[in-house]
Design a protein with these regions (language model features):
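Amphipathic alpha-helical segments
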Residues: 18-29, 94-99, 169-180
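Short coil/turn motifs at beta-sheet boundaries
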Residues: 41, 78-80, 125
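Glycine/small-residue-rich interface belts in oligomeric ring/scaffold proteins
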Residues: 16-76
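Vicinal oxygen chelate
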Residues: 6-17, 46-51, 56-57, 70-169, 181-209, ...
Length: 209
């Protein structure tokens, strides 16, 4: 497969308490965050803006009676943990077509009262990464993200993701992504999915696991 313009759009850090996790990341790493919103499937989040438009998503249970809220509570099993990684692509429809995947529409009620929509492909293949496209002009998204970065008030000057550690074999991941060129490190013998992530900062690389 071609590279398809893949980049790490965001990493999902599943947490028991979104606000408490945000405070801990501020205290331990100097990472600020901004309010996110409520996904219609029953999860809620805060956003840690990194080099625009990438981010670390703090994802918690918003409504434990809805499907995604139930799934997240089960996946966390009583502890905060890295949960998933998400890739942006040039053309979501083409990426989905090449893999025989349907696309799905997601919606989110934002803290500012607005509503955002996005499309995904590949979410049922968890914990392999899924693909995402936001229904917003790329230039407008970049401006929003630059403002969020300022509003977060980071103490460490975070930049881009420097690496991801995953338990999936190179063969499995290459079959899923193709020639991706992403900064992925494989951990032999580890369970499938993401285990650690590196973030470039003005203080040096920080690692969350």
């Amino acid at each position: 497969m071609l590279t398809e313009g893949m980049y790490i759009d965001h990493v999902i850090y599943g947490v028991l308490d979104v606000d408490a996790a945000a405070e801990r990341l501020r205290r331990d790493y100097g990472l600020g965050s901004v309010p996110g919103g409520i996904h219609l499937g029953g999860t809620t989040n805060r956003i840690v803006p990194l080099a625009p438009p990438t981010f670390l998503e703090l994802l918690g249970v918003g409504d434990p009676t809805l499907g995604d809220g139930v799934w997240l509570a089960e996946a966390l099993a009583g502890r905060d943990r890295l949960l998933w990684w998400v890739l942006g692509v040039d053309d979501l429809d083409e990426t989905a077509r090449r893999r025989g995947l349907p696309t799905q529409v997601g919606m989110m009620d934002m803290a500012d009262g607005s509503q955002r929509t996005f499309r995904t492909a590949g979410m049922p293949r968890y914990p392999l990464p899924f693909f995402i496209s936001f229904d917003i002009d790329p230039g407008a998204r970049m401006r929003i993200w630059q403002a969020r970065y300022r509003d977060a008030g980071h103490d460490c000057g975070p930049g881009a993701f420097s690496f991801l550690e995953v338990g999936d074999t190179p063969e499995l991941l290459d079959a899923w992504l193709g020639d991706h060129g992403l900064p992925v490190r494989h951990v032999p013998g580890a369970a499938s999915g993401i285990h650690a992530v590196g973030i470039e900062t003005a203080r040096g690389e920080l690692v969350i696991c």
